[in-house]
Amino acid sequence: MTELAAVSFVYPDLDALAAETAKIAVLVPAEGTLNPGARRLNRLTKGAVARAVESAAFEKLKSGESLSLGYPAGMASDEVILVKLARNAKPLEARKAGAGLGKTLGKEGLLIWAAGLGQVAELAFGAALRAYRFDARKSKSEDALGPITVCATKRDEAEAAFADRRAVAEGVFFTRDLVNEPANVLTTTEFADRLTAMADLGLEVSVLEEADMEKLGMGALLGVGQGSESPSKIVVMKWMGGGDGAPFALVGKGVVFDTGGISIKPSAGMEDMTMDMGGAGVVAGVMRTLALRKAKANVVGLVGLVENMPDGKAQRPGDVVTSMKGDTIEVINTDAEGRLVLADVMWYAQEEFKPCAMIDLATLTGAIIIGLGHENAGVFSNSDDLSGAFLKAATAEGEGAWRMPMGPAYDKLIKSRVADIKNVGGRAAGSITAAQFLGRFVKDETPWCHLDIAGTASVSSATDYAPAGATGWGVRALDRLIRDGYEG
C-alpha cells in the first residue's frame, strides 16, 4: 500500500528557520499582516517576503492559493511558499490550502508554519491527502517523499485532532491503490487476499466462493463472471464496535475488469475499465478507516468481485438468470453487469445482517457522467432522511454529490417480455433506470442509497486532493456519515 507521508506537529521555533532545509510554507492573511514566522523569514530574506506580500501577484491570489520564492538568500531552504489564508479559515478552506502544499512535497520535505491557525489538523489532512503518487508498477520508483512538519501553537491539540484524519487518509490511499492497479495484478483473488489481510486490523473478514453462491441461488452475480478464468467472490468485512445494534451496510460493485462481455465495449478507452471495481474499493477504504480509528459503530462491508469477459462460456444477450431474491432477469446487455452483481450482494446483505440502513456504490453508468460530469456522484434513495444525511456529510467533506429522481414511472422502461425484469432500458434516463433496477432488491423496511460514482471514482486530470487517476471519492463522506449518525 502507498504509505502516507510522515506528518508530525511541533511547537514553533523561530531560531530554527534559517537552517531548515525543507521547503518552508508560511500563512499570510489577505490583509498581508506578517505573523512572527513570516517576520523572521522576511528578515532572513532581507525583505523579500514583505515585497512579495505587497505585490499584485499576491493580491490576486484566492484564499488557499500560494506564491513561491525560489532559492531565497539567507536561507538553507530552497523555497519559501507564502499561502494566503486567514487564521480563522473554515475547515475546508484550510484543507484545500494544505492540499496545495501537499502537491509540492518532494524528497526534501515540507515545514508548514501554521502557528495561530485554528484548523491546523485540517491543513495537515489536506497536505497528506494530496501527497499521493502511485508508482508501484514502475521499474524505478521516484525518491521517497520527505516528511510534513507542522508548526502549531497548540501542538498537542492539533496532533490529537489529526489522529482520526490520518485514519481517513489511509483509507483513501487504500482505495486509490486498489482502483489504480492494473487488472492483471488486481484479480478477484488478489483483491480478496488484500481485504482478508485487513483482519490484522481487527476486522472480521470472510469470503464466499462460487460454490457458496450457487447454494444461495446467486444466479445474477454468477452469470457475470462465468466467462472469466478468475473466480467470482464475495468478501464480507465486519466491524462491530458499537454494541448490539443492527449494522450499517455498505455494498460495493467490484468488477475488476469490464470488457462488456459479449456486448463488448469499443477498444478505445477499454484500458480504463480497470477502475470498474471503484465501488468495492471505496467500501474497502471505509472499512479500513473504521478499523484504524476504532469506530464505535457496527458496519458491514460487502463487495462482489467478478471479471466480465467474453468467452465460450460467457453470458449472452437474451439469457434469463435467477437472482438470490428469486426474481428472474432478462440480460439485454451484458455490459450492464454491475447491477446484476449488486442485486445479489444487496439481497444477501439484507438477509444475513438485517441492516439499519444500506448504501451501495458502483461505477454503474456512463449516463451519470453525461448528467453530472466528474464533479458530482449521483445519489438515488428511497429515504429522504438517509439521503439528506449523506448529502450533508458529503458537503462537509467537500465531496460532490447530487440527488437524482426515482419513481415507478421509470419501471416500465425495464419491463421484460420474458422475465420479471430486464437489466437495461433504452437510452432515456439510463442512470435512473439502473437505480430503479437496484431498488427491486431493497426490502421495504431498509433505508437505502445508491451512489453512482462512475464520474468521480477516477479522473483524467488532477483534483484539489488527488493527482490524475483514482480519487478515493466517498471514503471521507461515508466515514463522516457513520461518525455523525451511527456511532454510539
Curated annotation (Swiss-Prot):
Mn(2+) 1 binds at residues 258, 335, 337. The keyword Cell membrane does not apply. Mn(2+) 2 binds at residues 253, 258, 276, 337. Binds 2 manganese ions per subunit. One of its GO terms (molecular function) is manganese ion binding. It comes from the Bacteria. This is Probable cytosol aminopeptidase. One of its GO terms (cellular component) is cytoplasm. The active site is at 265, 339. Belongs to the peptidase M17 family. Its EC number is 3.4.11.1, 3.4.11.10. NCBIfam families: PRK00913.2-2 (NF002075), PRK00913.2-4 (NF002077). It comes from Dinoroseobacter shibae (strain DSM 16493 / NCIMB 14021 / DFL 12). It catalyses: Release of an N-terminal amino acid, Xaa-|-Yaa-, in which Xaa is preferably Leu, but may be other amino acids including Pro although not Arg or Lys, and Yaa may be Pro. Amino acid amides and methyl esters are also readily hydrolyzed, but rates on arylamides are exceedingly low; Release of an N-terminal amino acid, preferentially leucine, but not glutamic or aspartic acids. CDD domains: Peptidase_M17. Pfam families: Peptidase_M17, Peptidase_M17_N. HAMAP family: Cytosol_peptidase_M17. Its main location: cytoplasm. Gene3D superfamilies: Leucine Aminopeptidase, subunit E, domain 1 (3.40.220.10), Zn peptidases (3.40.630.10). Its cofactor is Mn(2+). It is an enzyme of class 3 (hydrolase). Keywords: Aminopeptidase, Cytoplasm, Hydrolase, Manganese, Metal-binding, Protease. It is found in: Cytoplasm. The lineage of its organism: Bacteria, Pseudomonadati, Pseudomonadota, Alphaproteobacteria, Rhodobacterales. Presumably involved in the processing and regular turnover of intracellular proteins. Catalyzes the removal of unsubstituted N-terminal amino acids from various peptides. One of its GO terms (biological process) is proteolysis.
